[in-house]
Amino acid sequence: MEKIIIDENQFLRTISRISHEIIEKHQRLDNIVIVGIKRRGAEIAELIKKKIADLANVELPSIDLDITFYRDDLEYAEPDSKSPTYSGASSFISIHNKEVILVDDVLYTGRTIRAALDALVDFGRAAKIELVIFVDRGHRELPIRADYVGKNVPTSRSEEVQVRTLKFDNCYEVALLSPTK
């Protein structure tokens, strides 16, 4: 069973709110790099980057980060699935002494964020890393928390949260999928 929990209007308002929060929290924006975790986290990061540009008239540098080989669950991949390929980052931007805004779509166990933090080390030593999560669904296995949250959605472990974006799904919405009985 599927339930839409964030429609397109709510989705875009959430992007706007998170962007405002980032601007309000940072006195200077010229030391910020936005890093989006591929795939949907990168698209959400791009939306936030564009909104900040509209609001503050500043173009922030950004990176689309592939964390494939930093994950700790590759051995659990389906035996019939293709071998993972690493596409790296969209560009190399040093994050040394920069404030990094790390963006992902869903925060669940925390393992994706741990992998992203490991991957970021290859880009330098950040002055600070803050986390933007579009949907926090709970069930953490690691001590990870977001600095900016679009929406908290309590779920059961059997449910799935899907953040849908224009680039990958031809729409902006968030769906909660429950197993059929």
UniProtKB/Swiss-Prot annotation:
A motif (PRPP-binding) lies at residues 100-112. It catalyses: UMP + diphosphate = 5-phospho-alpha-D-ribose 1-diphosphate + uracil. InterPro entries: PRibTrfase_dom, PRTase-like, PyrR, PyrR_bifunctional. Its EC number is 2.4.2.9. The keyword Transcription regulation applies. The keyword Secreted does not apply. One of its GO terms (biological process) is regulation of DNA-templated transcription. Keywords: Glycosyltransferase, Transcription, Transcription regulation, Transferase. Belongs to the purine/pyrimidine phosphoribosyltransferase family. PyrR subfamily. This is Bifunctional protein PyrR.
